[in-house]
Amino acid sequence: MTIMRKKHPLLKLINHSFIDLPAPSNISSWWNFGSLLGVCLMIQIMTGLFLAMHYTSDTTTAFSSVAHICRDVNYGWLIRYLHANGASMFFICLFIHVGRGIYYGSYMLLETWNIGIILFLTTMATAFVGYVLPXXQMSFWGATVITNLLSAIPYIGNTLLEWIWGGFSVDKATLTRFFAFHFILPFIITALVLVHLLFLHETGSNNPSGLNSNSDKIPFHPYYTIKDLLGVLLLLMVLMILVLFFPDILGDPDNYTPANPLNTPAHIKPEWYFLFAYAILRSIPNKLGGVLALILSILILAAFPFLNSSKQHGLVYRPITQFLYWIFIANLLILTWIGGQPVEYPFTTIGQISSILYFTIIVVLMPVANMIENNILXLH
């Protein structure tokens, strides 16, 4: 069997990726989230496939088909809630994975990092089009508001908007194409994940110390397969607690009302994992400015490798930048909270301050902290 796994063209590929892969001996549990994201992706594709068998993308029947899945299909309620809450778990793992990358300086693996940003954007797009599919109140109005942002693009905005809608509002054509996008995007994500891993295995994993670990590598199996398995069990436990005890805690009550184009919900807001970006979008009074800030809030991640001038890898031995990092995380949580609040004082002001702070920490404060820390190093 050993010879088989090392010689067979297909098994050799799997062997070099998951079995005989040389991994640093000191990577912590923060490195578990990559494999957890893989598990989340598999759960989403499998549950999504079964949901697609019973879902209809017509505006007149979409809401009823989701109700039919929950009421009449064997374990349909379970599949539906696994899919909905699985998306939340996906984004929790994604945020931690990116946060770990920033903390430990993994962004210096340029290709892996950039593919990761593309993956992040693709996952956000998938989640957005998926949220529209039940054709309920918040789905409909969320789709209307977010797609409407395209009209802020000069000259071609309105034409582009009507082209994406397939009409003059979110209607049957929109729902059908969003279903098509939602079906194909996870497979594109899977392909991108393979490219992500390909680039990662070219350089090898980063590790908490930030030092070169080539002199101290251990095989991925059995050490990290067992470690990842523990993470997977914990993830599934949290997911099942969510699904079986609090299935609607992360959803919106408005989504249990069929879409009504004549009645606008009091507070239109996206799913919780988009709230930080939504808060940044809302904090700028100008429409085009808001859209640019929204896009930049994610694309700013691509600037990390170029803004980093530190002589040390990662933030483990850099207290000033470490302090800024945790302020940044706290600020992100504040933005998430603000995104779910109505547009009124004091929420708007807090949102504007947090949005400014979000970009200032990354573009100004962290590079300055890098320089200060480099000077402190030079003094010793």
From Swiss-Prot:
It is found in: Mitochondrion inner membrane. It holds the Pfam family Cytochrome_B. Binds 2 heme b groups non-covalently. Heme b b566 binds at residues 97, 196. GO terms for molecular function: metal ion binding; ubiquinol-cytochrome-c reductase activity. The keyword Translocase does not apply. InterPro entries: Cyt_b/b6_C, Cyt_b/b6_C_sf, Cyt_b/b6_N, Cytb/b6-like_sf, Cytochrome_b, Cytochrome_b_C_euk/bac, Cytochrome_b_N_euk/bac, Di-haem_cyt_TM. Its cofactor is heme b. Keywords: Electron transport, Heme, Iron, Membrane, Metal-binding, Mitochondrion, Mitochondrion inner membrane, Respiratory chain, Transmembrane, Transmembrane helix, Transport, Ubiquinone. Its main location: mitochondrion. The keyword rRNA processing does not apply. A ubiquinone binds at residue 201. It is a multi-pass membrane protein. Component of the ubiquinol-cytochrome c reductase complex (complex III or cytochrome b-c1 complex) that is part of the mitochondrial respiratory chain. The b-c1 complex mediates electron transfer from ubiquinol to cytochrome c. Contributes to the generation of a proton gradient across the mitochondrial membrane that is then used for ATP synthesis. Heme 1 (or BL or b562) is low-potential and absorbs at about 562 nm, and heme 2 (or BH or b566) is high-potential and absorbs at about 566 nm. The cytochrome bc1 complex contains 11 subunits: 3 respiratory subunits (MT-CYB, CYC1 and UQCRFS1), 2 core proteins (UQCRC1 and UQCRC2) and 6 low-molecular weight proteins (UQCRH/QCR6, UQCRB/QCR7, UQCRQ/QCR8, UQCR10/QCR9, UQCR11/QCR10 and a cleavage product of UQCRFS1). This cytochrome bc1 complex then forms a dimer. Belongs to the cytochrome b family. This is Cytochrome b. The lineage of its organism: Eukaryota, Metazoa, Chordata, Craniata, Vertebrata. The gene is MT-CYB.
